[in-house]
């Protein structure tokens, strides 16, 4: 009872075909195909672009901080 039989699917398919018609479904599938092609083209272009080499880390010179005035007087 909970599963859909083949007759349920046939009725659903018939209703979809009646609502959308052959032309709209064809246009929809064409748009999906164009989207997939565009996505694949974008991914291929992304792979072709040379990766910018990472800049090597630079060492920051350490500067000694001057001692506070109170420590200078004690010495």
From Swiss-Prot:
Region Disordered, annotated ranges: 43-75
Gene Ontology CC, one term: TAT protein transport complex
The keyword Disulfide bond appears for this protein: no
Biological process, per Gene Ontology: protein transport by the Tat complex
Residues that span the membrane, as ranges: 1-21
Keyword Ligase: no
Pfam families reported for this sequence: TatA_B_E
Membrane-protein topology: Single-pass membrane protein
The entry's keywords: Cell inner membrane, Cell membrane, Membrane, Protein transport, Translocation, Transmembrane, Transmembrane helix, Transport
Domain of life: Bacteria
Subcellular location field: Cell inner membrane
GO molecular function: protein transmembrane transporter activity
Homology family: Belongs to the TatA/E family.
Functional summary from the UniProt entry: Part of the twin-arginine translocation (Tat) system that transports large folded proteins containing a characteristic twin-arginine motif in their signal peptide across membranes. TatA could form the protein-conducting channel of the Tat system.
HAMAP family in UniProt: TatA_E
Quaternary structure, from the entry: The Tat system comprises two distinct complexes: a TatABC complex, containing multiple copies of TatA, TatB and TatC subunits, and a separate TatA complex, containing only TatA subunits. Substrates initially bind to the TatABC complex, which probably triggers association of the separate TatA complex to form the active translocon.
Name under which the protein is recorded: Sec-independent protein translocase protein TatA
